[in-house]
Amino acid sequence: MNEEIRQRTKWFMEDRFGMFIHWGLYAIPGGEWNGKVYPGAAEWLKSWAKVPSGEWLELMKQWNPTKFDARKWAKMAKEMGVRYVKITTKHHEGFCLWPSKYTENTVANTPYKKDLLGEMVKAYNDEGIDVHFYFSVMDWSHPDWRYDVKTPEDSAAFSRFLTFTDNQLKELATLYPTVKDFWFDGTWDASIKKNGWWTAHVERMLKEMLPGVTINSRLRADDYGKRHFDSNGHLMGDYESGYERRLPDPVKDLKVTLWDWEACMTVPENQWGYHKDWSLSYVKTPVEVLERIVHAVSMGGNMVVNFGPQADGDFRSEEKELAKSIGAWMKKNGQCIYGCDYAGWEKQPWGYYTRKGSDVYMVVFNCPYSKHLTVKTPKGTQVVKAALLNGKSVKVVETARNEYNVDMPAQEPGEPFVIKLQIKEAAGVVDKYRDALT
């Protein structure tokens, strides 16, 4: 990774943990249309139920989130321990949370009228939380959107659509200059892949307007239609964003530790927008959410956990409870997350390693009956001492060269816990390990 990209993505290593907000007209029906409940992703309901755009956009007349309070949203995120939030400025349906002058399908033309996006940007920034913009290139509401470009008429229409999209992106960058990142979606269709030049143009345009802004890999396509990574295998954009509701394997996929990457996950199995019935799919527990966060950080990545607000502007009780649970754990254990990176140590069944400087953190999710946690260090690395984050020492016994048993606490904490290892290593150990991966 070149130094220019590394400087732009320094926030990755510092922040590590973010929140996703999927909010749009789809929150009003909440997965149900004309009496039928669709188990698929609620933000795709227009597609599942085959609702014409004109009929779908009639939902704008009902958009009036009277319980919305951006300051409460921001405080909840702060208490949860997130360092940044990604907000859906516009999802595939085409409804804009800001008063765009390039379309009628905006919050300005609803009973609510006010600039929701602007309220959120200010509230989150006031809490010290960076704001990132999700933006769907695909726009079901626009007459010039095309899934493919096959005729001269398609080409002319799609050219107009790209100009429209340019204008909306420039508008967002101008109205909200504190935005730190653009996270693009809806770029997988042939129409975009045949216009890879445009994705490169958008990246340049935004970086000229907002020096330091980062762009996800999902935007980009090269001249051959390859996405995320070009035909030569080089990452496009500033960080890889292909890990959606999945994570790289901690043993087989170590290549990801060589670049910045970010995963995003839902709490139900596949619901990004608000769905009224979470019983239709498995819902992750707070510990399962925590494990995915730690898993990502242990491989040098970030994790973004999604919340789908209700149409009235409030969050469902399950999301509020999840935020409290995650926040309580982060308050005690956040030092093993923020600013941490891949440790380069052999994965063990009890959990994950993260690293910050000469400190290696053991984040324990699975407790062995032996009460001993096996640690295997790279050649040239010694464990000097071990302690819980409250400062209590933990016994360490060297059982073989570069192998140790680390005792569990006398009393199990009843939740995932962290042991900090202070280490000493020969010069160049980490660099040699990373070089071996290239």
Spell out what each predicted region is.
Residues M1-T438:
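Mature catalytic domains of secreted/periplasmic carbohydrate-active enzymes
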